[in-house]
C-alpha cells in the first residue's frame, strides 16, 4: 500500500485553511470573470507576466516590454519558452514528472548552458550548482537523485492533499535540490505552475503565481532556506508563504487588470 506523503504536510497548523483560502481566491476570479469566457489571449498574457516575474526572481534585468518584443536576456527568453509549452506539459506531469522537469530545463536553459547540458541531471562528477542566491549549498548528487526520484514517485500516487500543497512542495524540492546545472529557479517555478494547472487549481492558467512569488521576493530565499533546514516548521512556513503567493497571483491576473 502506497504512503501519502503529502497529506501530513497539508495537516500542519494553518496550512489547510491557507490552501483553502488561496483556492477560493482563484475560484472567485474564475467564477466572477466566467471560466468559459477566458480566451487564449488571457492565458497568453498571464503566462507572459509569469515569465517576466520568474526571470526577474532569477536575476533578469529585462523589462516587461523587452519580454513582449522578444528582446529579453537569456533568463527571460528561457522563461518565455517555458510558458510556450506549459499547458502541453501539464497533463504529463502526474505520469512522467522527471521527463517534464528535464523538458522544462531544456527550454529554460537553451541560452544559458551548452547543448549537452540541456535537460541533464547532474552527477557526482560535476560541480554543485549555486544558481539560486541565498540558499544553503545544494546536496550532493546521490542525495539529490534519491530525493528527486522519491518526489517523482510520490507525484504519481493518489493524495488527499490539496493541489496547492503538492505544487508548493515540488517547487521547494527542485529549488533546494538544484538537480540541473543551471536555471533551477525557473524550472522550480514552472513545475509549480504546471501542477496548479494539472491539479485543476487554475486549469486555464490565467493567474500569475510567479508574480505572487515576486511580490513576496523579500522572503523567497529565506523561505526556501527554512524549508531546507528547519524541519517541519520550515516546511509549514514555506507552504503558508506559497498559499499567499497563489492568492497574490490571482490578483495579478489579466482578468483583473
Model-derived segments and spans:
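FIC/Doc superfamily catalytic core
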Residues: 1-257
Amino acid at each position: 500500500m502506497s504512503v501519502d506523503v503529502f497529506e501530513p504536510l497539508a495537516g500542519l497548523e494553518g496550512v489547510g485553511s491557507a490552501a483553502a483560502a488561496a483556492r477560493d481566491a482563484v475560484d472567485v476570479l474564475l467564477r466572477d470573470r466566467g471560466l468559459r469566457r477566458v480566451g487564449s489571449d488571457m492565458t497568453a498574457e498571464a503566462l507572459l507576466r509569469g515569465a517576466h516575474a520568474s526571470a526577474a526572481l532569477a536575476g533578469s534585468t529585462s523589462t516587461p516590454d523587452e519580454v513582449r518584443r522578444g528582446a529579453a536576456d537569456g533568463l527571460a527568453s528561457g522563461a518565455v519558452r517555458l510558458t510556450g509549452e506549459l499547458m502541453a506539459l501539464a497533463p504529463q506531469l502526474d505520469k512522467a514528472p522527471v521527463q517534464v522537469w528535464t523538458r522544462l530545463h531544456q527550454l529554460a536553459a537553451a541560452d544559458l548552458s551548452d547543448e549537452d547540458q540541456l535537460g541533464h541531471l547532474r552527477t557526482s562528477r560535476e560541480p554543485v550548482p549555486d544558481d539560486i542566491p541565498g540558499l544553503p549549498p545544494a546536496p550532493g548528487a546521490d542525495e539529490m537523485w534519491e530525493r528527486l526520484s522519491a518526489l517523482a514517485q510520490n507525484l504519481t500516487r493518489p493524495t488527499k492533499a490539496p493541489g496547492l500543497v503538492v505544487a508548493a512542495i515540488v517547487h521547494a524540492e527542485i529549488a533546494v535540490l538544484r538537480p540541473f546545472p543551471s536555471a533551477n529557479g525557473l524550472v522550480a517555478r514552472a513545475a509549480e505552475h504546471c501542477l496548479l494547472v494539472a491539479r485543476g487549481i487554475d486549469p486555464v492558467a490565467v493567474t500569475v503565481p510567479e508574480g505572487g512569488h515576486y511580490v513576496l521576493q523579500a522572503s523567497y530565499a529565506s523561505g526556501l532556506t527554512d524549508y531546507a533546514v528547519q524541519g517541519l516548521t520550515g516546511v509549514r512556513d514555506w507552504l503558508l508563504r506559497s498559499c499567499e503567493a497563489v492568492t497574490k497571483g490571482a490578483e495579478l491576473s489579466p482578468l483583473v487588470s
